[in-house]
Amino acid sequence: MTMENDNKGYLLTLICDNSDDKAEKIFLNPKILYIPDVATKEILLLTNELKSKIDLSAQALTLTLTNKNNGVSVDKECEIKDLLDPDMASLMVKDLINIVRGYDMD
Protein backbone atom coordinates (compact mmCIF):
# COMPACT_ATOMS: atom_id res chain seq x y z
CA MET A 1 0.00 0.00 0.00
CA THR A 2 1.46 3.35 -0.99
CA MET A 3 0.66 6.60 0.67
CA GLU A 4 0.13 9.53 -1.64
CA ASN A 5 0.70 13.04 -0.41
CA ASP A 6 -0.96 15.08 -3.11
CA ASN A 7 -0.79 18.80 -2.44
CA LYS A 8 -4.13 20.22 -3.55
CA GLY A 9 -2.82 23.73 -2.99
CA TYR A 10 -4.33 26.95 -1.79
CA LEU A 11 -7.20 28.67 -3.56
CA LEU A 12 -7.17 32.47 -3.73
CA THR A 13 -10.65 33.73 -4.62
CA LEU A 14 -12.12 37.16 -5.23
CA ILE A 15 -15.91 37.11 -4.82
CA CYS A 16 -18.52 39.73 -5.60
CA ASP A 17 -20.85 39.50 -2.60
CA ASN A 18 -23.87 40.89 -4.48
CA SER A 19 -23.82 38.51 -7.43
CA ASP A 20 -21.61 35.60 -6.28
CA ASP A 21 -19.47 36.05 -9.40
CA LYS A 22 -15.89 35.08 -8.65
CA ALA A 23 -12.37 34.78 -9.97
CA GLU A 24 -9.94 32.27 -8.50
CA LYS A 25 -6.51 30.74 -8.82
CA ILE A 26 -4.77 27.79 -7.14
CA PHE A 27 -1.26 28.07 -5.74
CA LEU A 28 0.60 24.91 -4.77
CA ASN A 29 2.81 26.95 -2.45
CA PRO A 30 1.21 30.12 -1.05
CA LYS A 31 4.56 31.41 0.22
CA ILE A 32 5.18 32.86 -3.26
CA LEU A 33 2.43 35.35 -2.41
CA TYR A 34 4.56 36.78 0.41
CA ILE A 35 6.49 38.58 -2.34
CA PRO A 36 4.59 41.90 -2.64
CA ASP A 37 5.00 42.19 -6.42
CA VAL A 38 3.67 38.66 -6.95
CA ALA A 39 0.70 39.19 -4.62
CA THR A 40 -0.13 42.51 -6.28
CA LYS A 41 0.06 40.96 -9.76
CA GLU A 42 -2.16 38.03 -8.81
CA ILE A 43 -4.76 40.30 -7.18
CA LEU A 44 -4.76 42.47 -10.30
CA LEU A 45 -5.30 39.38 -12.48
CA LEU A 46 -8.24 38.27 -10.31
CA THR A 47 -9.66 41.80 -10.29
CA ASN A 48 -9.43 42.06 -14.09
CA GLU A 49 -11.05 38.65 -14.52
CA LEU A 50 -13.95 39.71 -12.30
CA LYS A 51 -14.18 43.12 -14.03
CA SER A 52 -14.73 41.30 -17.32
CA LYS A 53 -17.90 39.78 -15.81
CA ILE A 54 -19.37 42.68 -13.81
CA ASP A 55 -18.88 46.34 -12.90
CA LEU A 56 -16.88 46.36 -9.67
CA SER A 57 -17.16 50.07 -8.91
CA ALA A 58 -19.92 49.82 -6.30
CA GLN A 59 -19.67 46.16 -5.35
CA ALA A 60 -18.99 44.57 -1.97
CA LEU A 61 -16.07 42.17 -2.45
CA THR A 62 -14.52 39.37 -0.41
CA LEU A 63 -11.00 38.03 -0.79
CA THR A 64 -10.71 34.41 0.38
CA LEU A 65 -7.81 31.99 0.83
CA THR A 66 -8.63 28.30 1.25
CA ASN A 67 -6.25 25.46 2.05
CA LYS A 68 -7.60 22.79 -0.31
CA ASN A 69 -5.81 20.07 1.69
CA ASN A 70 -7.74 20.56 4.93
CA GLY A 71 -10.57 22.95 4.04
CA VAL A 72 -9.43 25.81 6.28
CA SER A 73 -10.63 29.05 4.75
CA VAL A 74 -10.34 32.69 5.79
CA ASP A 75 -11.75 35.75 4.13
CA LYS A 76 -11.56 39.50 4.24
CA GLU A 77 -14.10 42.00 3.03
CA CYS A 78 -12.56 44.59 0.74
CA GLU A 79 -13.25 47.35 -1.73
CA ILE A 80 -11.96 47.72 -5.26
CA LYS A 81 -9.81 50.71 -4.24
CA ASP A 82 -7.98 48.49 -1.72
CA LEU A 83 -7.36 45.81 -4.32
CA LEU A 84 -5.93 48.34 -6.76
CA ASP A 85 -3.54 49.73 -4.13
CA PRO A 86 -0.39 47.55 -4.39
CA ASP A 87 0.60 47.94 -0.73
CA MET A 88 -2.89 47.24 0.57
CA ALA A 89 -3.45 44.30 -1.79
CA SER A 90 -0.20 42.57 -0.85
CA LEU A 91 -0.85 43.17 2.86
CA MET A 92 -4.34 41.62 2.63
CA VAL A 93 -2.95 38.52 0.92
CA LYS A 94 -0.13 38.23 3.47
CA ASP A 95 -2.62 38.45 6.36
CA LEU A 96 -4.80 35.71 4.86
CA ILE A 97 -1.79 33.43 4.32
CA ASN A 98 -0.59 33.94 7.89
CA ILE A 99 -3.99 33.03 9.31
CA VAL A 100 -4.44 29.92 7.14
CA ARG A 101 -0.88 28.74 7.78
CA GLY A 102 -1.41 29.31 11.51
CA TYR A 103 -4.22 26.75 11.40
CA ASP A 104 -1.94 24.39 9.47
CA MET A 105 0.56 24.45 12.33
CA ASP A 106 -2.01 23.60 15.05
PLM segments and residue spans:
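Charged, amphipathic alpha-helical segments
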Residues: 1, 33-54, 87-106
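Eukaryotic multi-domain/regulatory proteins enriched in long, charged, Gly/Pro-rich low-complexity regions
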Residues: 2-4, 13, 18, 74, ...
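Negatively charged, low-complexity tracts enriched in Asp/Glu with abundant Ser/Thr
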Residues: 3-48
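Sterically constrained small-residue positions within well-ordered secondary structures
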Residues: 3-5, 54-56, 67
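A short, structured beta-strand/loop element
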Residues: 12-14, 57-74
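Generic detector of low-complexity/intrinsically disordered segments
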Residues: 13-16, 52, 63, 85
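Short, compact, well-ordered microdomains
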Residues: 66-98
